[in-house]
UniProtKB/Swiss-Prot annotation:
Induction: P450 can be induced to high levels in liver and other tissues by various foreign compounds, including drugs, pesticides, and carcinogens.
Species annotation: Mus musculus
Binding site for heme: C446
Organism ancestry: Eukaryota, Metazoa, Chordata, Craniata, Vertebrata
Described purpose of this protein according to its UniProt entry: Cytochromes P450 are a group of heme-thiolate monooxygenases. In liver microsomes, this enzyme is involved in an NADPH-dependent electron transport pathway. It oxidizes a variety of structurally unrelated compounds, including steroids, fatty acids, and xenobiotics.
Protein name: Cytochrome P450 2D26
Subcellular location per the Swiss-Prot or TrEMBL entry: Endoplasmic reticulum membrane; Microsome membrane
Name of encoding gene: Cyp2d26
Entry similarity comment: Belongs to the cytochrome P450 family.
């Protein structure tokens, strides 16, 4: 009997191995066509997962681009992926072919946090009616609450004052500015979503931001890629909770805030914020099975907007201050322009931006150099397309490599160096390049771009108006190499702030 069990076991093993090999062959059959983009030979089962450095994906893609060209393919386990590089190809993919390439691939790892039917938020929602409904709502509601208007500018300016006060308290000794920058930017988002402002010492606020920071990278690294490629693994009891502990904790804190907010909502009163406006739409949509306005989707939309709006802008500001202490000559020129245009008494305004070409160029160069979302979020073809003489089938995951655009050697004079003159002409006037694409392009471009531009200019200019920043005495010069998470963050650093 024991021998029989052993034979049966080996039969199962052999059958399973053959089955997996056949599945693997089926998934890679498109690579056999002459018109499919070239790429490295995948291993059976794992594909190219072991051939990509998930701690430095931009560099991995750079090497593959040099070998295979601007359009190359990968096989992530059983998931076909095409990576697109360079300004011309990326813009063609996102803009010219936008109607066919704006879908999102399935990401099963998010199902455990509430993604599902009619609850896919905005950022990861498939390209279609639900996405259009939520994007239209988000853009119009943010405008209703001040986006692009003087009222929100005043709110940001007021928060910049609180940020400068917090910097003043730290000015006696070296400190890491990133936590304070996160608090300031988070308060702007919180004002739009929750109609509230947190004190910087608030324990709940600090716990939420700490948890969010610790969650970065949990869903974008090697483990997340494997689980998305082989979703059956997510059915292993307890695995999602163990793989994404901090992300789950952050979502629990967001749920707590939404429950508290819901208790104070009065449908008879005008909406106080985006959450109120969403709840009003939920009431209107009752009985409509086609609507994406429901309580589950409210949570996902709030998480989308909070994470996207806070993390990217605060990270960019952290890069900005790092680059100021590494390039004191650039900082001096920014100080000079601020003194000439704004002075030391009044607060900076968005109207000043047009008269401050150098400061504007510095902010743009920070975004280009920092390159905080190098591979963008993945897209997916919604139908077969012929692109750059290649055939890409429906359902193929697409990675528009924004890093290859922001560091394109054919566009930028010094692509790997921090060089604000990239955005200035010979007369010192500001010039915006077509290859400046930190917010992506096309239908899936960042809906919060106007808010981010406002925050970057006002926070950066207010800080440089009030302080001079330097590397602390006795400390080594910080590195300008980033840590690859999503987004790419600077290595932890400290600075000294001296009042001007």
């Amino acid at each position: 009997m024991g021998l029989l069990v052993g034979d049966d076991l080996w039969a199962v093993v052999i059958f399973t191995a053959i089955f997996l090999l056949l599945v693997d062959l089926v998934h890679r059959r498109q690579r056999w066509t002459a018109c499919y983009p070239p790429g490295p030979v995948p291993f059976p089962g794992l594909g190219n997962l072991l051939q990509v450095d998930f701690e430095n994906i931009p560099y991995s893609f750079y090497k593959l681009q040099n070998r295979y060209g601007n359009v190359f393919s990968l096989q992530m386990a059983w998931k076909p992926v095409v990576v697109v590089n360079g300004l011309k190809a990326v813009r063609e993919l996102l803009v010219t072919y936008g109607e066919d390439t704006s879908d999102r691939p399935l990401m099963p790892i998010y199902n455990h946090i509430g993604y599902g039917h009619k609850s896919k938020g905005v950022i990861l929602a498939p390209y279609g009616p639900e996405w259009r409904e939520q994007r239209r709502f988000s853009v119009s509601t943010l405008r209703d609450f001040g986006l692009g208007k003087k009222s929100l500018e005043q709110w940001v300016t007021e928060e910049a004052g609180h940020l400068c006060d917090a910097f003043t308290k730290e000015a006696e000794h070296p400190f890491n500015p990133s936590p304070l920058l996160s608090k300031a930017v988070s308060n702007v988002i919180a004002s739009l979503i929750y109609a509230r402002r947190f004190e910087y010492e608030d324990p709940f606020f600090n716990r939420m931001l700490k948890t969010l920071k610790e969650s970065l990278g949990e869903d974008t690294g090697f483990v997340g890629e494997v689980l998305n490629a082989i979703p059956m693994l997510l059915h292993i009891p307890g695995l999602p909770d163990k793989a994404f502990p901090k992300l789950n904790s952050f979502i629990a804190l967001v749920n707590k805030m939404l429950i508290e907010h819901d208790l104070t909502w009065d449908p008879a009163q005008p909406p106080r914020d985006l959450t109120d406006a969403f709840l009003a739409e939920v009431e209107k949509a009752k009985g409509n099975p086609e609507s994406s306005f429901n309580d589950k989707n409210l949570r996902i939309v709030v998480i989308d907007l909070f994470m996207a709006g806070m993390v990217t802008t605060s990270t960019t500001l952290s890069w900005a201050l790092l680059l100021m202490i590494l390039h004191p000559d650039v900082q001096r020129r920014v100080h000079q322009e601020i003194d000439e245009v704004i002075g030391h008494v009044r607060h900076p305004e968005m109207a000043d931006q047009a008269r401050m070409p150098y400061t504007n160029a510095v902010i743009h160069e920070v975004q280009r150099f920092a390159d905080i979302v190098p591979t963008n979020l993945p897209h997916m073809t919604s139908r077969d397309i012929k692109f750059q003489d290649f055939f890409i089938p429906k359902g193929t995951t697409l990675i528009p490599n924004l890093s290859s655009v922001l560091k394109d050697e054919t566009v930028w004079e010094k692509p790997l160096r921090f060089y604000p003159e990239h955005f200035l002409d010979a007369q010192g006037h500001f010039v915006k390049h077509e290859a400046f694409m930190p917010f992506s392009a096309g239908r899936r471009s960042c809906l919060g771009e106007p808010l981010a531009r406002m925050e970057l200019f006002l926070f950066f200019t207010c800080l440089l108006q009030r302080f001079s920043f330097s590397v602390p005495d006795g400390q080594p010069r910080p590195s300008d190499y980033g840590i690859y998470t999503m987004p790419v963050t600077p290595e932890p650093y400290q600075l000294c702030a001296v009042a001007r």
